[in-house]
Every structure is written in structure tokens, then in C-alpha cells.
Amino acid sequence: RKDEYGGSLENRMRFMTIVMEEVMKAAGSDIAVFVKMNMRDGFRGGMEIEETLEVARRLESLGVHALVLSGGFVSKAPMYVMRGAMPIRTLTHYMDCWWLKYGVKLAGRVMIPTVPFKEAYFLEDALKFRSEIKIPLIYVGGLVSREKIDEVLNEGFEAVQMARALLNEPGFVNRMRREEKARCNCGHSNYCIGRMYTIEMACHHHLAEELPLCLQKEIEHLENK
């Protein structure tokens, strides 16, 4: 954009600032306002941490109650936020559009490159926010064990968010209360991600239907890499 909403970071924050001023005014003292934001977009030319820290400072100054720290860009860097490999066979299996299915089969691994999974993969960047931002921060990304969650909370984060760990084991939080070494059984095949664009998100451990053999083999391959 070439107008007052594009170009410099200050201009690009203008619309956000206008919106958040109205949101905070409407919320008053009755509603807690959390903002989920990227620390990095995860692709060349996207926002990096120097700029997003400025965004966080602006949100803090606007009176936001907490920030949820994430990253990635679904259309350009989906695995930056999800981590691991995209299960291309699963993704195309559930597609109805024949030409899209064919195109993803041919170029999917180039279009959606793998980003290796590790526990708490956003923690290094999130700690930079923790040292600069005073309002509550909620950590998200790669939490699959009580031990790592305890580590994150001990670093000063007020709360954590989980997704795939709870898809894999809905009672995982209750098990963590009982077991100090609790760890979910998610194998990071990303089957749940592969199907979420066409049907409901679900872990392959909790399906009513039987998986086709080709998808079983893909899951086994990805989980044993």
C-alpha cells in the first residue's frame, strides 16, 4: 500500500491501533482482551522479531490484557507454525477438487517444505518478548510433556496453550496432574493437519472410520522418521 496504512511499521500498525482502541473501549472492565500475534512470519520478506516486538509494545500501551505468542503464515509458511512434514497423501486424499489434488501431489513437497519439530520450538523467540513485555504472555508451540510445560512456566509465562497434544489425548491435562513425567503420545505425523482443510480436524488414533492402507503407511513413515 502507498497510503497512510502501508510502508513504514508505524503506518502498518495504524489500522491495528484504531481497531484496538475501539475494542478496548467496548470491552471496558468487563472483558479480558487477549491478542494472538506472530513473533516471526517464517518466510523471506515477512515480519521479523524486531518489528513484532514493536507491535507487542504498542498493544501493551493500548491496554491489552495478554498476548498469545505464535508464528507462521498459513498460505506461505504453514509448517513454521505446525512443524514437521505435511502429510501430502493425507492432504490430497480428502480433497474433492481434482486439479488441486493433482497439483498438490506433484508439487506439494516443494510448496510446503518440512520444518523440523522440537519441543517448545517457539521458546527462544518468546523469551525475548518475556524480557521486554510486562503484561501476561501465553506460550504456544510444541508442548507435549509436563516437564517442558513446567520449564516454560518457570521462565515467567503466565499460561500455555496446546492443540495437537489434546487432539491426541483429550485427558492429557488430567494425566499431567497425576504424573510428573507425563508425555502425550502424539507422533507428529500431522495427519490431523492434513485433513483439517477439507473435513473436521481429528487425530488418527480417534477415528470412527478405518484409515485406507496408503494413509496408514504414510503415518507410520512420518512417525518413524
Which residue ranges define each predicted feature?
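Flavin-dependent oxidoreductase catalytic cores
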Residues: 1-225
